């Protein structure tokens, strides 16, 4: 599966199938939240939050790719990410969307 944030694939003719998306919502761990509050005081990267963002994004991408595969797509182009916190910041939601396409001649 080809994934691209561009609206084209070099030297390929594409057939548009449909818009696809992946959504993932994660809740923060209370123990990690306490440790993060200490980091807020002294500064620095909050690794547990960085890992959570990466995990949420990866899961959302996997869901989008699965939807594209179910439609018979070879690629997803024009990929966009949106992220928001919910429930007073204790929950993180990531939405990944793109256009599922079939690469002609493949």
Swiss-Prot record:
InterPro entries: UPF0145_dom_sf, UPF0145_YbjQ-like. SUPFAM superfamilies: YbjQ-like. Pfam families: YbjQ_1. It comes from the Bacteria. PANTHER family: UPF0145 PROTEIN SCO3412, UPF0145 PROTEIN YBJQ. Belongs to the UPF0145 family. This is UPF0145 protein CTC_01500.
